[in-house]
A protein has these predicted regions:
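Long amphipathic alpha-helical segments
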Residues: 2-84
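Catalytic-core signal marking the mid-to-C-terminal active-site face
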Residues: 12, 383-452
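Short Gly/Ser/Thr- and Asp/Glu-enriched loop/turn motifs at secondary-structure junctions
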Residues: 19-20, 38, 93-97, 306-309, ...
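Glycine-rich phosphate-binding segment of PLP-dependent enzymes
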Residues: 52, 95-96, 106-132
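Long amphipathic N-terminal alpha/beta scaffold segment
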Residues: 63-109, 116
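PLP-dependent enzyme catalytic core of the Aspartate aminotransferase-like
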Residues: 110, 115, 422-480
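Conserved PLP-enzyme active-site core in the AAT-like
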Residues: 134-350, 475
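Conserved PLP-dependent catalytic core of the aminotransferase class-I/II
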Residues: 339-340, 344-404
Length: 480
């Protein structure tokens, strides 16, 4: 007769028969409290999954008897329920040095935008209702006047992101026609969003002109023909061509296109609405400038330099924007009421440009004085050093950050922060990974970056130091 498996005869191991049935587990008084708090459906479902998992462990001989005790089962079930209810999207502390971080939600919403959003969503609102006439309204009205006032355009519409704005513009103005673009502007942005692929998806034929580094007016003139539906300029926001280069400006290109009866569209990508040079930052093209130069359509993002929610903003002539607004695809790409409310409040802030550097988080962080960041680094260094000792050392260091999200890609922002290095050089990589993981595991996760065998915490975006320092005891405990 075969000898029983060790797990069966080992008295320290639990067997599948030791596990209670789901109904029996749920009848316990401690579980009744869970059901009262969270409802029967959720608790019963998690109890079933818990017992299934424990049963697999028991059959494999890997389940200790302590795990099947009533108190242990209640604790495990409570953990499962709370984990299931925990939000997957969480607030974090961005110490990466990238202000508008694509993976960390891009632009921070300003206080007025958050307040307006909460106030409107607490009850019904006039999203598509005309209060004056009592009839059906148009959600574009919420922001169109603001956009035309700020940019000088005749009309405006909005969709849910700038990729959608570009797709919709091409589809509405050049479907089954040709779109002329310089070879040097056939960009790819994050997520494999390639301009040639967008053209194809919009039902237009791409016509490339010029070369990668030099395109002239004559190249556009020669390419325009009876099948041309659109001439397009694409701002290379996430890379830079330098050296022996040439490009045609919007004003000259508008004259060429309009002389042949063809509209000109410009995709600005990041889309700042204020001259960044006034704040000591490199200048980005403005929608206002593009409109004044004669562009029929200008599109740009809402959640980058503009400092608002994710949105694709389209401004231009009444004729061009009218065609875009009435194109069938527009409804599928329209903004929902939440980001539209936040966008309205953000755009209202631009009516008082003198206050933007104080009130708009994105601009406030980009223009934060270096001396202030350096002082913060010096102040935090002792506390962090004590929390990570004796395995790591901490020093205050100068750093170079960046704007992020494809905005001004070659520019760096002088900053300051804390550099954490392992005391033991052997296994330094693993030690830094462990520290980074411990920071991410904090209740309010801290995200830095590893470079040159150190974990760097750029403090430009840390405005409330208390959010960081109050978690240092937890970090210290995690590193023991």
């Amino acid at each position: 007769m075969a000898r029983p498996a060790e797990s069966v005869v080992d008295g320290s191991k639990a067997q599948a028969k030791d596990l209670p049935a789901v109904d029996r587990l749920l009848r316990g008084p401690a579980i009744a409290a869970l059901v009262a708090e969270h409802g029967h459906t959720l608790v019963a479902g998690e109890a079933r999954l818990l017992l299934d998992g424990l049963r697999v462990q028991a059959l494999a001989g890997a389940l200790g008897r302590a795990a099947v005790q009533p108190a242990a089962l209640v604790g495990a079930l409570d953990d499962r329920v709370r984990t299931r209810l925990a939000s997957r999207m969480r607030r974090v502390i961005n110490l990466t040095g990238t202000v508008i971080h694509t993976n960390l939600g891009r632009a921070l919403l300003a206080g007025p935008a958050l307040e307006h959003l909460l106030a409107l969503m607490a009850g019904p609102n006039n999203l598509e209702y005309d209060l004056a006439s009592g009839g059906r309204g148009d959600r574009d009205v919420v922001v169109e006047e603001l956009l035309t006032t700020i940019t000088g355009a005749q009309a405006a519409t909005v969709v849910n992101n700038n990729a959608a704005a570009v797709l919709l513009t091409i589809a509405a103005l050049a479907r089954r026609k040709e779109v002329i673009v310089s070879r040097g502007e056939l960009v790819e942005i994050g997520g494999a969003f390639r301009m040639p692929d967008v053209m194809a998806a919009a039902g237009a034929k791409l016509v490339e002109v010029g070369t990668t580094n030099r395109t002239h007016a004559r190249d556009y003139s020669a390419a325009i023909g009876p099948r041309t539906g659109l001439v397009m300029k694409v701002h290379a926001s996430n890379y830079a061509l330098q050296g022996f280069t040439a490009a045609v400006g919007e004003a000259e290109l508008a004259r060429i296109a309009h002389a042949r009866g063809v509209p000109l569209a410009s995709d600005l990508g990041s889309g700042s609405l204020v001259d960044l040079a006034a704040y000591g930052l490199p200048r980005e093209p403005l929608p206002q400038d593009q409109i004044a130069a004669g562009c029929d359509v200008v599109s740009f993002s809402g959640d980058k330099l503009l400092g608002g929610p994710q949105a694709g903003l389209i401004v231009g002539t009444k004729e061009a924007v009218g065609r875009i607004r009435t194109f069938p695809l527009k409804r599928a790409l329209r903004m929902s009421k939440l980001p539209l409310a936040a966008l309205e409040a953000t755009l209202r802030m631009y009516l008082r440009p003198e206050l933007l550097a104080r009130d708009l988080p994105t601009l406030r962080l980009l223009t934060r004085p270096l001396a202030e960041i350096e002082a913060l680094a010096a102040a935090l260094q002792p506390a962090l050093a004590a929390a990570v000792a004796p395995r790591y050392t901490v020093e205050s260091v100068p750093l170079l950050g960046q704007i992020g999200s494809g905005s001004l890609p070659v520019e760096r922002l002088p900053s300051a922060g804390l550099a954490i290095g392992p005391v033991q050089k052997k296994g330094a990589g693993r030690a830094l990974d462990a520290l980074a993981a411990a920071l991410r595991a904090l209740p309010l996760p801290v995200i830095g970056r590893i470079a040159e065998d150190r974990l760097l915490l750029d403090l430009r975006c840390l405005e409330d130091a208390g959010l960081f320092t109050t978690q240092l005891p937890l970090l210290q405990e995690a590193l023991r």
